[in-house]
């Protein structure tokens, strides 16, 4: 395997499953763009329809709630940016880590995790549904870009290292240690075996670990920011012992690795930060808005820089890539991030109005799924109709239905339901 002395990645990392013909549309006398393989991969994800659809898919609150909502797309952009900054400090390829951030939620269905739950119910007898496995399926087959010699879709035909950087759960359903999450379906096991060739079993590459931590940081900090702006979260609860104890109790039930005492200590540390105190009772004034933005910026820096420093201390100097290091995050920092997640859970996701809305969303997905199946292939988009017609059994046909719904934006799903499948 060829490795440039200045490039810590080798030809094996840059290999694609399907060989691609040279481009032919360039003008005579011109040269193609001088881009790395990972820069090309990043561009493929950036220009994909699946990424654009995330603009109309829920992060925490719906994409049409409020004037400046966070969607799955804006969240993915934030994860990509945080990950890229961490890659600078660790010596990972910047395009590779940014790509992983952009693609980490590309398989999410309408209504985010709530939609995942509904589609998992729809496909329960046929392998279920998982957003992370759908990420892999989109990148390796569903998103049109490259065909193999038999005319089958190879998806975006990303390099091995790029695909591996998106895999947070490198196993199939039921194979993961202590988690129900999984990274690919049985249907995609050949592609997964190709990507994971030579990789340590059950272990994420460093670039995927960076993406995963960037996801945690973005989710915890920015979703709390949205909660503060919407007046659902008041950060002063962190300094109230009774409120903090209630959050710690909830957190202990949600995070098995973080105890109540750890949550209480995290609340004391965060509430003592000047940037937290400066937000106070948010009132949307200029001063309050600036204070909140400074808070989010400083917390992102706090959590990202802690991971960089701790990893460097353990792994030493030089480029840290692929399986040459493990991302190390201090336990106290993990507790702080977990506490912010609990704030969003307590004051946003546990709101009875939010839960009622979610119940209606799941019903809609079930309704549309059965309407699609009953009328298939007529009710499906052409690509999915062809897949339905050639499906070998009922399980494969239901997988097509799930793929179709997962591809919908929330607006399209709701229009279809109102027009065809509604009561």
From Swiss-Prot:
InterPro entries assigned to the protein according to its UniProt record, in alphabetical order: dGTPase (IPR006261), dGTPase-like (IPR050135), dNTPase_2 (IPR023023), HD/PDEase_dom (IPR003607), HD_domain (IPR006674), PHydrolase_assoc_dom (IPR026875)
Alphabetized SUPFAM superfamilies for the sequence: HD-domain/PDEase-like
Metal-binding among keywords: no
Ranges for domain HD: 72-220
GO biological process: dGTP catabolic process
Keywords (A to Z) from UniProt: Hydrolase
Region (Disordered): 1-38
Pfam family, one: HD
Molecular function terms, GO-annotated: dGTPase activity
Keyword Hydrolase: yes
Compositional bias annotation for Basic and acidic residues: 1-20
Protein family per UniProt: Belongs to the dGTPase family. Type 2 subfamily.
Name this polypeptide is given: Deoxyguanosinetriphosphate triphosphohydrolase-like protein
Organism: Mycolicibacterium paratuberculosis (strain ATCC BAA-968 / K-10) (Mycobacterium paratuberculosis)
